[in-house]
Amino acid sequence: MKASVLLSRGAAPSALVEADLDDPRPHEVLVRIEAVGLCHTDLATRKALGDRPAVLGHEGCGVVERLGSGVAGLEVGDRVVLSFAHCGRCVQCRSGHPAYCDLAITLNNSGRRADGTPTIRVDGVPVFGSFFGQSSFATAALVDARSCVPVGDVPPWVAAPLGCGFLTGAGAVLNVLRPGPGDRLLVVGAGAVGSAAVLTALSEGVEVVVAEPVAARRELASRFGALAVPSLDDPLPSVTHALDTTGRPELLNRALSLLQRRGTLAVVGLGPATAEIEVRDLMLRGLQLRGCVEGDAEPAQLVPELIGRCEKGRLPLDELVTTYGLGEFDRAVVEQREGKVLKAVLIPES
């Protein structure tokens, strides 16, 4: 099938080009993309790939157009959110933790299917595709059926970030930290992931403190009901739980210092490979330091839960989103990086 895809080559401007997508295999689905979120992981991967041509994008939402012969539970015409790929067979997948799938790297970051075959060709030449099992910076994407979560009539530009960014922030709160009424959560960094965590915690009746240098993001967090400060160096109350979205070692240590005894810090920001942590303090105060990928979520369960909260007015994720045309990718990157927008979502031109 022909599709328009956003082809990236390192730091060079991205370009919309025509590509050929494979026909769906028995376990695959062809989805017409209606919206796709822009995530920091897309930009980090583009940088890591250097000049290798790639079709990225991993927060897609769209309509099922074709089904592989072995797909059950989906119908042509279903609107679906596309989340990360997982095998569905390993111990982690079977125990409800697909983000830690044994094949996670192969299925999400190899640029091809698990068997090594490509899914996207430009001018007959295979390019890096199957990113997070989808490569949805495009008008259409070929995905594994396990990655598709039906979402009904939710606006696609709101639903798309539920595939990764909003899923990560919300899941970190609901699945990993699990604070409740009477607890106080510190969120370090109020970008898309952090803001989704803020809204989710507030919907649980949790008191929330936010450290965020960008004034517009602080103002938004304050309007939602959080206490927002520019820096962790500001006077802050102690907290029962903390979530770091930055991965910066100095902020990790400051967040740990603000935890009450037996408190928990979850880390979702990917920073340097190493960091110095005061292990004795962790031991003596009974602190926990938790890693967290994709909110440790089962998308098929958490995405509908979050949509339900949105529909009831408990989770106004739509207020975090700014839309752009797919061809405006480079402008969206700049404006999101500069803090002019919180969550950029790209809409493929019809």
Where are these regions (language model features)?
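C-terminal hydrophobic helical "lid"/dimerization subdomain
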Residues: A3, A300-S350
